[in-house]
């Protein structure tokens, strides 16, 4: 009996660790540095599986990282992470956390800073646009992360991180992947991707027109994490009423490949730049608070999120105030002589579009 039990135990141990859905990747054709990354992701209802990371944006460089959505036991969440690098002069820190966003250090496969958001949520069968932009702040580089729901059309600023390295831009090629982190390969998980863009450092936009699909072949051998689902994967290009998109399927016994590992795929792109509605200032107001001028404003959430602002004070002593602060909606200007004046506000969005000038009048004696 003891010998039989030992054989059973050994058999179980040999099978354990071989039941993960194959990790699958799409690597796009951007082999140059840039400062903005965009990709759209959709998880069809049949492709939703718990313990899955549907990574949508991944990049290399001195601030390598990734972003995407997850089917997590707590909720459908968003994740944005940046790895530590030997060239960093200080730890990565969060300088802005959107509502519901949490940040924490991570370890394991390298170290760095991770952000989670379990409150915003995402739904199956809905396209979500994920955007990350990096910009130089002195000797550091900031990284912002935004999401847009295809259902509501609204944008959300989830997090901004400060990386202590100058000009640490996004290096290509940008990638997306599917990861089953708890060996639930019996469940098929599917990712749809489209509308990928990268802005080059000269300001020109590059559309992701080609991608290489691959599966981690080293995980398919006997004893490896995906051996029991070594033939249950697929990827390529598909089309529905919304147009063409890249797809990846990992896991599920019914899943069978219709392409090679690796294989090349393409979607013809005709647009020359992203087509999202540019930023619009919804409302603004100005008031006098002692010897301080206070300007507050609100942007339309259905238009591209704010990246920076510029305020022109046309009074007795004209002044200009500006900042690359995506979360700023209030600015205070110390002005001793506050007479009758005009205030002009312009915002620039995360893709570089400028809003129409919003003009406010400040009456004398207020």
Predicted segment positions?
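Carbohydrate-binding surfaces in secreted/extracellular proteins
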Residues: 122-157
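Short, aromatic/His-centered strand-loop micro-motif at the edge of beta-sheets
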Residues: 106-127
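Secretory/extracellular carbohydrate-interaction modules
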Residues: 17-102, 117
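Beta-strand-rich modules
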Residues: 335-354
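Recognizes extended acidic, P/S/T-rich segments that occur
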Residues: 310-337
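Extracellular fibronectin type III
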Residues: 351-365
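Activation corresponds to long, low-complexity, non-globular regions
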Residues: 17-34, 40-50, 183-297, 304
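Solvent-exposed loop/turn segments flanking beta-strands in beta-repeat/beta-sandwich domains
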Residues: 300-312
């Amino acid at each position: 009996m003891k010998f039989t039990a030992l054989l059973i135990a050994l058999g179980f141990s040999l099978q354990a660790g071989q039941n993960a859905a194959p990790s699958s990747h799409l690597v796009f054709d951007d082999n140059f540095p840039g400062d903005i990354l965009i990709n759209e992701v959709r998880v069809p209802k049949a492709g939703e599986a718990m313990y899955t990371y549907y990574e949508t944006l991944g990049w290399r460089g001195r601030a390598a990282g990734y972003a995407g959505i997850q089917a997590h036991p707590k909720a459908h969440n968003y994740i944005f992470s940046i790895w530590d690098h030997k060239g960093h002069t200080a730890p990565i820190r969060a300088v802005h956390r959107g509502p519901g966003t949490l940040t924490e250090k991570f370890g394991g496969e390298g170290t760095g800073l991770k952000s989670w958001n379990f409150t915003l949520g995402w739904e199956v069968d809905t396209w979500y646009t994920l955007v990350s932009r990096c910009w130089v702040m002195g000797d550091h580089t900031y990284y912002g992360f935004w999401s847009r729901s295809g259902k509501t059309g609204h944008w959300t600023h989830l997090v901004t991180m400060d990386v202590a390295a100058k000009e640490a831009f996004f290096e290509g090629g940008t990638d997306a992947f599917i990861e089953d982190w708890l060996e639930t390969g019996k469940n098929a998980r599917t990712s749809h991707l489209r509308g990928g863009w990268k802005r080059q450092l000269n300001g020109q936009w590059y559309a992701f027109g080609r991608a290489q699909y691959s599966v981690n072949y080293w995980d398919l051998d006997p004893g490896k994490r995906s051996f029991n689902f070594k033939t249950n994967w697929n990827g390529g290009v598909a089309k529905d009423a919304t147009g063409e998109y890249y797809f990846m399927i990992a896991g599920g016994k019914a899943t069978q490949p219709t392409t090679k590992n690796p294989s090349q795929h393409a979607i013809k792109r005709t647009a020359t730049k992203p087509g999202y509605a540019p930023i619009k200032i919804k409302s603004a107001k100005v008031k006098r608070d002692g010897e301080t001028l206070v300007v507050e404003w609100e942007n339309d959430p259905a238009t591209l999120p704010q990246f920076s602002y510029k305020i022109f004070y046309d009074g007795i002593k004209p002044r200009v105030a500006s900042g690359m602060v995506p979360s700023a909606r209030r600015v205070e200007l110390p002005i001793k002589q506050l007479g009758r004046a005009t205030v002009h506000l312009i915002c620039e969005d995360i893709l570089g579009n400028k809003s129409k000038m919003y003009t406010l009048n400040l009456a004398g004696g207020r």
